[in-house]
């Protein structure tokens, strides 16, 4: 069965476009029916980020869940990993994060977590999709069995304590000046507070959400403001989170960006030296730079690749027993601590390494020289541009031109109508020519559809 609603990271789209109150209500009903197992009172934890449409979707989902007899615990703006953690710790049957992650405020989305705090599998999402296409009127709860909803206090402190416990008890961030950019998103309260409690000198930006400014010229997808602030304040490090704080990008004291691949390299090397890697390797996606793979090989570590999407990284980690994985975009999964990507906890692991080594971030966090990597996006309205003969021919020609001295990846986005064309290799000019040829072919195919 084709997937009409779920992408690689839940359901995501334009608020009041794809993501309507009607859809949110139906998702609440469908997921609520599917996760009511056993005779106990069933409940769901719902969190959100700071975008304006969060109110609309939150209340619609409350109506959906309570209409099928589930109690709802509302935690308000909280990081996605915090919602996953709370779902498990509060013994809920289900967790929901209302967020479109790094997208601007016009979009929103629905991420679902099972009772152990893990994102739902493809099979479970397909079951929910089947229910979305059915009439559920006859499956609603009786009047006396409707669910209740209430807001929960103290959840911020729970997450702060959880994050702090991922560091050694005797480790302090005293002496570190940290600029943190919370993207005017879900982490705007908890992360600055946690850093302060750990002893850092904290300078916060992106902590004034108004419903419209989430991810707007700030956060991990737009770290330029953070780079400037780090240099201006002569800070030791900058931390950029995205709107729901499940991804992170760092900035060194010189204002240079440290992406997810470099973070994986730092943590992998540190954990190997401390004997903390459960297996001699890590898991990343097909988008991770070949430079990371070569660095890990030099450390005696393997890089296992998966399709794009942190859920696929985690699935491979769990299946094969790895405890470190992530994406170039900054989703870092530390399965010893969390069930999903946690940008803040990942940043703390790097800060711990910096404190242990007592060296500048620029020396600690740039582990390898990345190969030239070029990524271009082509939007399309309809059809399947990748299935055309012209595009297939362009890809085949590009592979032959790289001739084993680089990589080529052409794929459809799982969250928006975009074809992503990525090439990397030792010869930047050749890579750029190959990528441009494929982009032209995809653009022509999209225009003809």
Curated annotation (Swiss-Prot):
It catalyses: alpha-D-glucosamine 1-phosphate = D-glucosamine 6-phosphate. One of its GO terms (cellular component) is cytosol. GO terms for molecular function: magnesium ion binding; phosphoglucosamine mutase activity; phosphomannomutase activity. It comes from the Bacteria. The modification Phosphoserine is found at residue 101. Binds 1 Mg(2+) ion per subunit. Transmembrane segments: none annotated. Mg(2+) binds at residues 101, 242, 244, 246. Its cofactor is Mg(2+). InterPro entries: A-D-PHexomutase_a/b/a-I, A-D-PHexomutase_a/b/a-I/II/III, A-D-PHexomutase_a/b/a-II, A-D-PHexomutase_a/b/a-III, A-D-PHexomutase_C, A-D-PHexomutase_C_sf, Alpha-D-phosphohexomutase_SF, GlmM_bact. One of its GO terms (biological process) is carbohydrate metabolic process. Its EC number is 5.4.2.10. CDD domains: GlmM. Keywords: Isomerase, Magnesium, Metal-binding, Phosphoprotein. Disulfide bonds: none annotated. Activated by phosphorylation. The active site is at residue 101. Belongs to the phosphohexose mutase family. Catalyzes the conversion of glucosamine-6-phosphate to glucosamine-1-phosphate. This is Phosphoglucosamine mutase.
